[in-house]
């Protein structure tokens, strides 16, 4: 569980959410069994709402792991979306490629292989949405590298970080105060 909310509350929230099926469910199970960090069910439901409202056409994801988020984004948005994602772990890259191929999304999702600090410098163009889900200690660096790439659409910016508040709550002086 997350250490942010009471385990029973988190369990209740997750039980009320619809289960994924098909490949996404397989990837959730694989991630759980192999301790691969992917977005949680409640986060994916929130992201689904954001995606449907914002309707990004070009997404940058920093931190691909097994490709779950990219596949999820593409499945929610369908049609006309381009997703560029970065990953440095060779095992994860191979697994992500396999999963993206199984999803039939090779034409929509591109994996840039290598350290994000370097691969981000090679990307051209602007993005409608940037999802940062990589080394939490590098978030400021990633922000600095990508903030100018975020397209301004109707004065709306969509920059998402995953698990940005967890280190705050894991500090001993705060660990029992927000549950």
Predicted segments with their positions:
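A short alpha-helical cap/connector motif
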Residues: 1-129, 136-157, 162-179
């Amino acid at each position: 569980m997350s250490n942010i909310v009471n385990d029973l509350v988190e369990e209740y929230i997750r039980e009320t959410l619809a289960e994924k099926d098909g490949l996404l469910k397989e990837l959730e199970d694989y991630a759980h069994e192999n301790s691969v960090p992917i977005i949680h069910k409640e986060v994916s439901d929130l992201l689904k709402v954001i995606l449907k409202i914002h309707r990004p056409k070009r997404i940058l994801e920093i931190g691909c792991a097994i490709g779950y988020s990219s596949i999820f984004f593409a499945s929610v948005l369908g049609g006309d979306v381009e997703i560029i994602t970065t990953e440095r772990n060779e095992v994860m890259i191979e697994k992500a490629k396999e999963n993206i191929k199984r999803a039939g999304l090779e034409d929509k999702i591109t994996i840039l292989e290598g350290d994000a600090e370097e691969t981000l410098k090679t990307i051209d163009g602007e993005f409608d949405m940037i999802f940062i889900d990589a080394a939490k200690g590098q978030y400021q660096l990633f922000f600095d590298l990508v903030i100018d790439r975020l397209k301004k659409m109707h004065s709306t910016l969509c920059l998402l970080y995953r698990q940005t508040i967890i280190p705050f709550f894991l500090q001993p002086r705060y660990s029992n105060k927000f549950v």
